[in-house]
Regions:
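C-terminal ends of transmembrane helices
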Residues: 55-62, 116-129, 133, 332-340, ...
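Transmembrane alpha-helix interface/packing and boundary motifs in multi-pass membrane proteins
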Residues: 58-66, 148-158, 200-210, 305, ...
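Hydrophobic or amphipathic alpha-helical targeting/insertion segments
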Residues: 94-178, 193
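Alpha-helical transmembrane segments of multi-pass membrane proteins
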Residues: 107, 139-153, 179-206, 232-241, ...
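C-terminal transmembrane helix pair
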Residues: 177-183, 243-246, 355-360, 370, ...
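Membrane-core helix-loop-helix motifs of multi-pass transport proteins
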Residues: 178-266, 457-493, 501
Length: 501
């Protein structure tokens, strides 16, 4: 019998595509949740939906299987259990409802558009151009990487693709060219510093544009929901609100990191030569790169609603429509082809997992779970005797620093943000609600600085071996606090100047 059991376990380890122990933990957790008494104020179906949602989040955190598979599992269980409807037909309609959400398709199409950056080589060229102009000192290279991130951010909704797939290879090549190699114990010459710049530029720029990271449209949806659509963050409004505090963080970040993790090599005149040599090797702009530049220009003009400003509101275009226009331009010009679209796995993966999380968030709201949890949280804060200012600060800090327990920004936002926003909307006076909401919006990307597993970019950069775990966490905490202070002081004043509140 022991031999047969060992054989069965060996089969599972070799053939079954999920991690056995995390899967068992997740299953036990689901059963445990379903066996608990239904809390007062919730229906049995609503509590079952809570169990499914929390189990999905746990499965994502434990990485039982890829996030897309876990999301599809959640959709299947929601449909099978009929927790959102009285019929199977209604339940499957609910489970698939969010796949028609324009915000989700905005991210999917923008990922497809961003594929052109890598295919044409324009992303690499942009990075090398900035380094060729700013790279005479190590800090200057840091600024070059930061500006590269800023330029690419509006068009690359996968911060992982941007920071890990475009900027990080450039950073590694530069570090290697100066003899900074973790395998040789020389990572602190330059690589540690540049890796941290690579990471923190990625998180800062992720918060500056709706289309800079995948969960941002979900944040927009939550903010609109808790304000009954009175505060709807358009692409332009988001970018304008985050412009000054975001640029301030981006300008200070390379200097701060040069103090927190100083590079041993300060002057790097050869970096300019390296970048110029690579640019010469690449040659002049290709036709594909020119089309990409033109397409990005069109996207920026349309996302900024300039036609509507000039010709009137009849020319206003939804951001998702604009993204489709950009994708169509790239396809009909041959810059990318249909096979590129089909093979961009991250886009279709995002459609599934993002759709499932949005769907469950919507159903939790419809079934009264969010209102129930928000009331519990609100009552707890009120019973503590906190004023609204302290309550607002506590909500922001709890939300941001609870990210230590999450390995996915999307999972964290899906699990907690709507409830925290709802509580804030109930406690903060109406005239001060907008700055609170915008601080929560900023915190949703600032928290990505904290750990080496905080977002998809983190393990890519950390895995290169240039930064130790202790350094990563220490620098991440300090930068998180500094960025929160910048947004809380400069950001709030900037939003007041803009007339947002």
């Amino acid at each position: 019998m022991p031999d047969r059991l060992k054989a069965v376990l060996a089969y599972f380890q070799q053939s079954v595509p999920f991690r056995l122990v995390p899967a068992a933990i997740t299953t036990v957790f689901l059963v445990f949740m379903l066996l608990l008494p239904v809390p007062d104020g919730l229906t049995p179906k609503a509590w079952a939906l809570v169990a499914i949602f929390l189990t999905t989040i746990l499965a994502i955190i434990l990485k039982v299987m890829p996030i897309g598979v876990m999301a599809m599992m959640a959709m299947t269980i929601v449909a099978l259990s009929q927790v959102t409807s009285t019929s199977s037909k209604g339940a499957i309609a609910d489970a698939l409802s969010s796949l028609a959400n324009p915000l989700i398709w905005l991210i999917v199409v923008a990922i497809l558009v961003s594929r052109g950056l890598k295919k044409t080589g324009l992303g690499q060229r942009i990075g090398l151009m900035f380094i060729s102009r700013l790279g005479r000192k190590t800090v200057g290279i840091g600024y070059g990487l930061a500006v590269c991130e800023l330029v690419l951010a509006p068009f690359t909704p996968s911060n992982t693709a941007r920071g890990g797939g475009i900027v990080h290879p450039i950073m590694k090549a530069i570090a290697s060219a100066f003899g900074s190699d973790p395998a040789k114990g020389t990572e602190r010459k330059m690589g540690t510093y540049l890796s941290l710049v690579n990471m923190h530029a990625n998180t800062i720029t992720s918060g500056m544009f709706i289309t800079a990271t995948a969960p941002n449209p979900l944040v927009v949806d939550y903010v609109a929901r808790v304000t009954n659509q009175s505060l709807h963050l358009s692409w332009t409004t988001w970018a304008l609100c985050m412009l000054l505090p975001g640029l301030t963080c981006l300008l200070l970040m390379p200097l701060l990191l040069s103090v927190l993790a100083p590079p041993e090599v300060k002057a790097t005149p050869d970096a300019v030569d390296y970048a110029r040599t690579e640019l010469q090797r690449m040659g002049p702009l290709s036709g594909g790169e020119r089309v990409m530049i033109g397409t990005f220009g069109i996207l920026l003009v349309l996302w900024a609603n300039l036609p509507a400003m000039v010709f009137g509101p009849a020319f206003t275009l939804d951001p998702t429509v604009v993204a489709f226009v950009g994708l169509f331009i790239l396809i009909i010009t041959g810059t990318i082809d249909w096979d590129d679209v089909l093979s961009e796995k991250s886009a279709w993966d995002t459609l599934i997992w993002f759709g499932a999380l949005v769907m469950m968030a919507e159903q939790l709201n419809k079934t009264g779970v969010i209102a129930w949890f928000s009331a519990l949280l609100k009552n707890g804060i009120v019973s503590a005797g906190l004023g609204w200012e302290a309550a607002a600060a506590l909500l922001v800090l709890l939300f941001v620093f609870s990210h230590y327990f999450f390995a996915s920004t999307t999972a964290h936002i899906s699990a907690m943000m709507l409830a925290f926003l709802t509580v804030g909307a109930a406690l903060v006076p109406p005239q001060y609600l907008t700055p609170f909401l915008l601080m929560m919006v900023a915190g949703s990307t600032i928290m990505m600085t904290l750990t080496h597993y905080a977002t998809g970019t983190s393990p890519i950069i950390f895995g290169s071996g240039y930064v130790t775990l202790g350094t990563w966490w220490r620098v991440g905490f300090v930068m998180c606090v500094i960025e929160l202070v910048i947004y809380a002081v400069l950001g709030v004043m900037w939003w007041k100047l803009l007339g947002i509140w």
